Each structure stands twice: as structure tokens, then as C-alpha cells.
Amino acid sequence: MKTFVLVSCLLVFTQIIYALDIKEISIMNRILEKCIRTVPKRENDPINPLRNVNVWYCAFTKRGIFTPKGVNTKQYINYCEKTAISPADIKLCKKIASKCVKKVYDRPGPIIERSKNLLSCVLKKGLLELTVYGKKK
């Protein structure tokens, strides 16, 4: 029985560790800190800077996910694999990200505006809460 419990615990921890890309999270944390400091604060910005579309736009632009030509869709959706907390969260994260990409990029408009609308969509649908960033303040 003890062996079964130990193996079960190891499987759970392996899934959690597998789901997170610690190196990428560390890089993104440094980028987010810089973006939080440099993005001008506006009157209607949320108290938590991680809920600010402009902060995420800054960070994803620095990571090369948002470019002048638009969003690198594959890289954006696969970012869920690097930051989602559990395998179930990865699946839901990808689903939300895919729906928002389709919804936003099927419409005409400037690339920057569409990229920010994409971020607004995923934040409103709760994608952040599925990742390690949902736990930060």
C-alpha cells in the first residue's frame, strides 16, 4: 500500500513538473518585471499589473510571439505547455487561446490592436488563472 501511494505521488509530481518550463518561466518573469516598470500606468489599468493587456503585449513582443506581422499563433498557443499548472489546464488553456486567436484575427484591423484584443480576450476568459501567473500578484 505504501508503495502504491509513493508511486501515485511521484506520478502527480512528474505531471506537474512536466507541465512547467522553469527556464521559460524565469525568462518571462524577468521580462514581465521590466515591462511592468516601463509600461505607462493609465487611470483605468487594473491594480494587478499582470491583468494589464499592455504589460503582456510588451512581454510577448519581447519574446517574439507578437511581431509586426501579427501573432505567431503556434508559439502563442504552445506557450500554454510551458506555463500551465496541470495537463488538464494545458488542454483548456490551448482551447481558450485558439478560440481567441480565431475570434480576433478573423476580423480586420491594425495588427497591434488585434494583438491587444487577443490578450484582452484570453484575460477575460480566465486563461491567466490556468498558468503560474494566475497565482502571482
From Swiss-Prot:
InterPro entries: Ant_venon_allerg_soli_2/4_sf, Sol_i_2/4
Tissues where the protein occurs: Expressed by the venom gland.
Source organism superkingdom: Eukaryota
Any single GO CC term annotated in Swiss-Prot or TrEMBL for this entry: extracellular region
Compartments, record wording: Secreted
Signal peptide: 1-19
Keyword NADP: no
Entry keyword set: Allergen, Secreted, Signal
Primary localization class, coarse: secreted
Family: Belongs to the ant venom allergen 2/4 family.
The protein's assembly and partners: Monomer.
Name of the molecule in the record: Venom allergen 4
